[in-house]
């Protein structure tokens, strides 16, 4: 049986990856991490979506230790989310080590259930520039997991080279445009769906959606062309 594990937050990107995986794999598991994120509603949204979409299993893991080690506006209510980059060139929403931990735990879970594929919605074209969302990082993590577990695990990143407009097209391609638009939580201020409209995440999401709706046919054609080039 062809199994996959999706790293799932309940946001736009991971939900798009989840619906795509459900169309491609025999059995899909979702794994969500409780790391003390700014909005506890994220966990509830992920649980509701996993149930609605009918995943084989949805595991919520407590990794709140990360909150004690990594200071970020995504984990601390007293740190406002800022549009400005810090001295290190990263936004204050960067949680150091987050995806290292998430992919390691997802790899352990995949090993235990006999899945060979891990799917994550990280993306190099996102505005953030997080180092643990880059393609070279994912390839390095993939190599480490394979060597450390002596198992042929593959980390898939369906969104790695897509912009936000094309990510909306991918959701639409998998018959999930409305679900992703109305039921996911991407907003830094904890508002489901279209969000607050002001935070960096909402701005990126809104611009991408409007562009897709205005240029639907051309963008879908561009997405299909990219997919054919990668296959």
UniProtKB/Swiss-Prot annotation:
Residues involved in ATP binding: 8-18
Catalyzed chemical reaction(s): 7-carboxy-7-deazaguanine + NH4(+) + ATP = 7-cyano-7-deazaguanine + ADP + phosphate + H2O + H(+)
GO biological process: queuosine biosynthetic process
Metabolic or biological pathway: Purine metabolism; 7-cyano-7-deazaguanine biosynthesis
Keyword Ligase part of the UniProt annotation: yes
UniProt similarity note: Belongs to the QueC family.
Protein name: 7-cyano-7-deazaguanine synthase
